[in-house]
Amino acid sequence: MDAREMKIKAAEAALAHVEDGMRLGIGTGSTAEEFVRLLAEKVAGGFRVEGVPTSERTARLCVELGVPLKSLDELPALDLTVDGADEVDPALRLIKGGGGALLREKIVAAASERMIVIADESKLVDTLGAYALPIEVNPFGLVSTRIAIEKVAARLGLSGELSLRQSGDGEFTTDGGHHIIDASFGRIPDAEALSSELNSIPGVVEHGLFINMAALAIIAGPAGARTLQANR
């Protein structure tokens, strides 16, 4: 079973949690896109959902495949969000934002009664941090914000390169008009402390640590999909 087949297995398992008539947050990334494709097949057969996309990219795919969409202002309370992750630890703490949609992903997840994370087994880790942590920042005062992030990291005993994410024509810009600093800390032993410290920096719009948000993680491997439940 290759990586895409594992993503499809995880998406299939998540789809079993989606009920007719649900208000659904729809994530961003390659695994979430497999979920959208499967959801679209059910919608074509008469299944009713209203989706809120977490990125313009997801919105375009949903429109292309016929998944009905609303804005979060139109559906401010959601039943369920299904989204991928860049890393998942045993406590269902996540690193997200590799696709650049972390702010909207977090807003949509917070507006949902439940969040289900879908991923292949390569994303399951003992401790977060091997994947660079995306930190969404305001373009104004970028150097000052970067220095503040470096100071936070030093206080917490973290080190590693901070890289301003690039795209084909310069700095990567999020759907909200912000930039992303990717922090390669290597290992984050206290994700809660780092989350709190980053939230205290005025120039940090949001970061990719999702803590106490996922209710379930569906992890797919060669033997199939298994479900991890949050213990809190």
Curated annotation (Swiss-Prot):
A Pfam entry, by short name: Rib_5-P_isom_A
SUPFAM superfamilies: D-ribose-5-phosphate isomerase (RpiA), lid domain (SSF75445), NagB/RpiA/CoA transferase-like (SSF100950)
Source species of the chain: Rhizobium etli (strain CIAT 652)
Parts of the chain that traverse the membrane: none
Protein name, as recorded: Ribose-5-phosphate isomerase A
Catalysed transformations (reactions): aldehydo-D-ribose 5-phosphate = D-ribulose 5-phosphate
Active site residues per record: E105 (proton acceptor)
Isomerase keyword on record: yes
